[in-house]
């Protein structure tokens, strides 16, 4: 939903990412913000309110954390590059729509589908990791002096 996306992005990319960029490298920014953003969702996964009940909780946590940290890397890059939280809000919203309303519904389901679809499966996490690696490399080069500004 728009209010929850906006709330998350104001907190994670609007406040946390710029503050972290004052004290650590781009690598530090993406690791800390990505893991914290993932951990923010973990209670809902543990309680069974968010996730995929067909796979183990450990599988869900691993791939969700990998996906969110990777996606957070891309969003931190665009946030710092544009100096605007709105780019992260738009990315987050588009990502949610694609995953929840397009990718998962059009996937042919079988007994193994739960292991590869949506935010809790392997496919999106692995694809996001490959894309995030490219953004991480760009970020390391472009924002090499982040923590040195203060």
Where are these regions (language model features)?
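Alpha-helical transmembrane segments of multipass membrane proteins
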Residues: 37-44, 71, 75, 99, ...
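C-terminal membrane module of polytopic membrane proteins
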Residues: 93-150
């Amino acid at each position: 939903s728009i209010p929850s996306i906006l709330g998350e992005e104001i907190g994670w990319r609007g406040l946390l990412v710029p503050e972290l960029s004052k004290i650590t490298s781009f690598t530090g920014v993406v690791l800390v913000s990505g893991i914290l953003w993932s951990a923010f969702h973990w209670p809902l996964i543990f309680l069974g309110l968010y996730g995929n009940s067909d796979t183990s909780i450990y599988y869900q946590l691993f791939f969700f954390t990998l996906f969110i940290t990777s996606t957070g890397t891309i969003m931190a890059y665009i946030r710092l590059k544009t100096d605007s939280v709105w780019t992260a809000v738009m990315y987050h919203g588009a990502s949610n729509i694609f995953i929840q309303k397009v990718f998962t519904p059009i996937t042919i389901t079988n007994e193994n589908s739960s292991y590869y679809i949506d935010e809790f499966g392997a496919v999106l996490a692995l694809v996001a990791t490959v894309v995030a690696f490219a953004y991480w490399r760009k970020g390391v080069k472009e924002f090499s002096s982040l923590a040195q500004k203060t």
